[in-house]
Curated annotation (Swiss-Prot):
Keyword Cytoplasm applies: yes
Key word Transferase present: no
Subcellular location(s) per record: Cytoplasm
UniProt name for this protein: Ribosome maturation factor RimP
Family per similarity comment: Belongs to the RimP family.
UniProt GO cellular component terms: cytosol
Length: 208
């Protein structure tokens, strides 16, 4: 069993959490997801189509189907209505992480080692807080980011601790698309080459 398999499960904590209303929503839905075999990726309020509450979820293996989205919606929607966390009309969006997914758990970094990612840190490292590069040398404490386009004077390799990250996501590349489709059969069935690959995210929208 490799490092990714050891920690890739429904109980694995996320590296960072939401604030404000998003945090309240997360606290409500997380206990509902685990018994169904899902885990939360993130909660985000978006100012599109009026107001959209995006709840991004996945199974422990990273998969999610349209039927899964429907199941999650039927489960969390009644509680959100009762708690009235958002005191105005909104659209509820249940979605999968997609190909250029957020990296929110250590297992995500192990799973996608060797791929390009964007990282934001809460502390300044080598004079910066935003980085772009290839994920390498993943450990339980952090990783090394190999810069793909280092500017003059910038380090080619940056060591980053997991405890210092406030945001991370994969960068869409041809290599990532090929790898993602190999790993996720559900994703390969959704993927339409002519469209933007980010459209391969499974999404269901509901008016509230």
């Amino acid at each position: 069993m490799n490092e990714a398999e050891k920690i890739s499960n429904l109980d694995e904590p996320r590296l960072f959490e939401e604030d404000g209303i998003e945090a309240r929503v997360a606290a409500l839905v997380i206990p509902l997801l685990k018994p169904l075999g899902f885990r939360l990726v993130r909660v985000k309020l978006l100012g599109q189509n009026g107001l959209t509450l995006q709840i991004m979820v996945e199974r422990a293996d990273g998969s999610l189907t349209v039927e899964d989205c429907e199941t999650v919606s039927r489960t969390v929607s009644p509680l959100l209505d009762v708690e009235n966390v958002i005191e105005r009309k909104y659209h509820l969006e249940i979605s999968s992480p997609g190909i250029d997914r957020p990296l929110v758990r250590k297992s995500d970094f192990f799973h996608w080692q060797g791929h390009l990612a964007k990282i934001e840190t809460k502390i300044t490292i080598d004079g910066r807080r935003k980085f772009r590069g290839t994920l390498t040398n993943i450990t339980q404490d952090g990783f090394i980011l190999n810069a793909d386009k280092a500017a003059y004077g910038e380090a080619m390799y940056t060591s980053i601790s997991f405890c210092d990250i406030i945001g991370a996501h994969l960068v869409l590349t041809d290599e990532l698309i090929r790898d993602a489709l190999k790993k996720n059969k559900d994703l390969s069935q959704q993927f339409i080459p002519e469209d933007n690959p980010t459209d391969s995210i499974q999404t269901l929208n509901f008016k509230k």
